[in-house]
Amino acid sequence: MLSAKILERSGYLRKQCPLCKSYFWTLRHDQVYCGDQPCVPYGFIGSPPVKVAVDSLTELRERFLRFFERRGHARIKRYPVVARWRDDVYLVGASIYDFQPWVTSGAVPPPANPLVISQPSIRLTDVDKVGRSGRHLTGFEMMAHHAFNYPDKYVYWIDETTEYAYEFFTKELGITPEEITFKESMWEGGGNAGECYEVLVRGLEVATLVFMHYETKEGKYVELPLKIVDTGYGLERIYWLLKGTPTIYDAVFGPFLDRARQKLGVPEPPAEVMGKASIYFGQMDPEVIGLEKAYDLIAEKIGVDGKWLREVFRPQEALYVLADHSRTVSWMIADGVIPSNSGAGYLARLLIRRILKNLKLAGIEAPLVELIDMHLKELKVDYPEVWAARDLILELVDLEERKYKEILKSAPTVVKKALDEARRRGAASLSPDDLVALYDSFGLPPEIVADVAKTQGVEVKVPDDFYSRLAARHAKKEKQPESTLVEMAKVIDLPRTRELFYEDPYMRSFKAKVLRVVDGKYVVLDQTAFYAEGGGQPGDVGVLKYSGGAAKVVDVQRVGHIIVHVVEGQPPPEGVEVVGEIDWERRYALMKMHTGTHVLIQSIRRVLGPHIWQAGAQKDIPSSRLDVTHYKLPTPEEVAEIERLANSAVQANLPVYVKIMPRNEAEAKYGFILYQGGVVPAREIRVVQIGPDSDPYDVQACGGTHLKSTGEIGIIKIQKVERIADGVVRFIFTTGLHALSYIQELERQLGQAAQVAGGSRDNVVEAVKRLASRAEEAERKWRHYAELYAKQMAQSLKAEQVGRYKLAVVELDDEDLAKKVAEEATGRDKDLVLVVMGGNKLSIFTGGADVAPIVKSLREVGFRGGGSRTFAQGVYSGDVKTLIDALRRALS
């Protein structure tokens, strides 16, 4: 039983709901049910419980924050919606995500204790219900107060938390105590769990009070050393309660919806119908009974025609989806998410395409950019960071809309192929897995697939929770496998290796004692200056010298707190002293690359924008790579400016500071830009700052070895920029002497090019233009003579009559010429089958005959290849006679 003094003192009764069997607390003796959906209907739509003058979300949020500030809570600035400090999820789904796992595990103290926050959060688990249910959102603000109770420090727990909730709703918002029900439940999320109260008013859950004291491990609850108060007050839910509008969207997005309806010519829906529909939707699960069945049941309850209800709902649903999804997408893009096919970008693209799909199905025609821009103007007061990213948001949305339109053009062809494939495997229609594949591979929404399939006489059932399934599959990050170089059990008992490479990155040699040798090639020392691979920087190489021998170090890896040296040759015996000598030239080059990487990514951000985040990096010699999130290939001018900025930072000889800082202190000072290189799993983090405190050029949490100043880099030269994936651009670059060697090689090649073109290095461009002009003229003449030759050859072909077709076999090594001959010959004679041989390559052209039976026959004699209906290409290494015999069999 979960009880609180305020409830007992106020006369609350504990009852059990006969429907859901949950226990709940109420002041009403006549209350039978728990007060939650679906056990009871909403009772506030059209009849809010109070007449409180709360005119905006802004005001409600501020009243909540001030309420808890007056009660000793420190107000904390909201965190980003992208959880860059976590290695398990992409997006923040609740305020407690801000403090998981570091604070909740006890590894790091909270930024304040107790604290209050209003955290924008994103959950896509019910994305299919958005716009339909009247209450579901993908983006919402979780207002919350948190307290962290340690064994030696008590802050507050169940009694105080429940009393705060009681006072906020009764005294701050004026809701009578009899309206408030406290329902007992169990909460679990993010690896933690605890008992909770769900706070309910007239059928609507407006807050959850979680008393977190468990960690979930392998399906079991393990007691935490901390007892954490984790509350969540739904900003939008409470505002809806106070307004009593038909749907949550009308309360939260009212002004935007009014303008959108006016712009698009969509009539305002009947408030009474929408309100009743929300009430009934709240009491049923469309995923269980089916969406279409839900519409019919609701229409029957309201007393209207089902078809009419769908016609009313469809445009409103599209606008509700637009309002919710566009705010969520704007939060994501403003926080650096680029729509793409992976990670958080996948989720952003999913939301944009759901908007476009719903608008299309509702018959609403308008540029999405214009609609979202209208919404951004509404959001700029509460979310200035979103307004600051307006240009980027609109550019990305426009790009996504253009891509989507191209995708729809391909729908008939793609769906036909999918249906053909389904028939080949004996299926009458497309399965949910087929729909997922069509979405992930081609971007086709299942509703569009179903419409296209219907024109081909096939009914396709679209799961009502299709997008929720997709979101769930892409919501979590893949765990990186831990090092398996050496079994942990073989070294875990050893003391932590002293890391000399951090104490002095310029140390070239050192003395150490051999603690253990594993499997004859893995050496553990008590201390080492050999850097262990990490953060995209390779491990050092070198040699371990000892009395009577030496072993070559070919790799260095970290296994937990132990550093393991991989050696070739006879390893040193355990217990002896060794002298480690690092390949300094290689290490120093890698230090230049690593510090250069930090300089380069900051330069890229300054030119391309703050949405740039590192998507991967590998420091190596002679070249390194840096992958960043960006939606298009940078222009040559942008690349040149990036390179100029980077080398300006090098020439400025900025100092490089490395400092160990408490995690909270570092995050408070520098923000989450610290995690450009990824999550750092530690209570204290190693911060690398380039430039002075007054004006740092770049700051990152990093475990690599770095230079003392940027001047040591010498030069940063970008060698290549390419798109390696949707939303990811790769920079290949080099530094120092390797950059000089690269530039010298370019100079050498430039000189050779000038010589070949008949000019000098000073006028090589003009010389190449002249050469290109002559080449174009030669190409034009070749095409002219090739066409003449093709006509002549086509006229003189010797063809053999085989059945109704004519068979001709010729030898031509030039593929372009072969195509011209084929076009000319098959254009003259539709019954011609022309086979062109060139080396072991074989091409088959027909004037109209289906090439498939021919290919099938040729495969029996060793041909490998395929093609379209009238053309096939592949390889054949057999003799000509066997080939011709197979052709005759196929055509006769």
Swiss-Prot record:
<dbReference type="InterPro" id="IPR050058">
    <property type="entry name" value="Ala-tRNA_ligase"/>
</dbReference>
<dbReference type="Pfam" id="PF07973">
    <property type="entry name" value="tRNA_SAD"/>
</dbReference>
<dbReference type="InterPro" id="IPR022429">
    <property type="entry name" value="Ala-tRNA_lgiase_arc"/>
</dbReference>
<dbReference type="Pfam" id="PF01411">
    <property type="entry name" value="tRNA-synt_2c"/>
</dbReference>
<dbReference type="GO" id="GO:0005737">
    <property type="term" value="C:cytoplasm"/>
</dbReference>
<feature type="binding site">
    <location>
        <position position="702"/>
    </location>
    <ligand>
        <name>Zn(2+)</name>
    </ligand>
</feature>
<keyword id="KW-0963">Cytoplasm</keyword>
<dbReference type="InterPro" id="IPR045864">
    <property type="entry name" value="aa-tRNA-synth_II/BPL/LPL"/>
</dbReference>
<dbReference type="GO" id="GO:0004813">
    <property type="term" value="F:alanine-tRNA ligase activity"/>
</dbReference>
<dbReference type="InterPro" id="IPR009000">
    <property type="entry name" value="Transl_B-barrel_sf"/>
</dbReference>
<dbReference type="InterPro" id="IPR018162">
    <property type="entry name" value="Ala-tRNA-ligase_IIc_anticod-bd"/>
</dbReference>
<keyword id="KW-0436">Ligase</keyword>
<keyword id="KW-0067">ATP-binding</keyword>
<dbReference type="GO" id="GO:0000049">
    <property type="term" value="F:tRNA binding"/>
</dbReference>
<keyword id="KW-0820">tRNA-binding</keyword>
<dbReference type="InterPro" id="IPR012947">
    <property type="entry name" value="tRNA_SAD"/>
</dbReference>
<dbReference type="GO" id="GO:0006419">
    <property type="term" value="P:alanyl-tRNA aminoacylation"/>
</dbReference>
<feature type="binding site">
    <location>
        <position position="706"/>
    </location>
    <ligand>
        <name>Zn(2+)</name>
    </ligand>
</feature>
<keyword id="KW-0862">Zinc</keyword>
<comment type="similarity">
    <text>Belongs to the class-II aminoacyl-tRNA synthetase family.</text>
</comment>
<dbReference type="InterPro" id="IPR002318">
    <property type="entry name" value="Ala-tRNA-lgiase_IIc"/>
</dbReference>
<keyword id="KW-0479">Metal-binding</keyword>
<keyword id="KW-0648">Protein biosynthesis</keyword>
<feature type="binding site">
    <location>
        <position position="598"/>
    </location>
    <ligand>
        <name>Zn(2+)</name>
    </ligand>
</feature>
<keyword id="KW-0030">Aminoacyl-tRNA synthetase</keyword>
<dbReference type="InterPro" id="IPR018163">
    <property type="entry name" value="Thr/Ala-tRNA-synth_IIc_edit"/>
</dbReference>
<dbReference type="InterPro" id="IPR018164">
    <property type="entry name" value="Ala-tRNA-synth_IIc_N"/>
</dbReference>
<dbReference type="GO" id="GO:0008270">
    <property type="term" value="F:zinc ion binding"/>
</dbReference>
<dbReference type="GO" id="GO:0002161">
    <property type="term" value="F:aminoacyl-tRNA deacylase activity"/>
</dbReference>
<protein>
    <recommendedName>
        <fullName>Alanine--tRNA ligase</fullName>
        <ecNumber>6.1.1.7</ecNumber>
    </recommendedName>
</protein>
<dbReference type="InterPro" id="IPR018165">
    <property type="entry name" value="Ala-tRNA-synth_IIc_core"/>
</dbReference>
<keyword id="KW-0694">RNA-binding</keyword>
<feature type="binding site">
    <location>
        <position position="594"/>
    </location>
    <ligand>
        <name>Zn(2+)</name>
    </ligand>
</feature>
<dbReference type="GO" id="GO:0005524">
    <property type="term" value="F:ATP binding"/>
</dbReference>
<comment type="function">
    <text>Catalyzes the attachment of alanine to tRNA(Ala) in a two-step reaction: alanine is first activated by ATP to form Ala-AMP and then transferred to the acceptor end of tRNA(Ala). Also edits incorrectly charged Ser-tRNA(Ala) and Gly-tRNA(Ala) via its editing domain.</text>
</comment>
<keyword id="KW-0547">Nucleotide-binding</keyword>
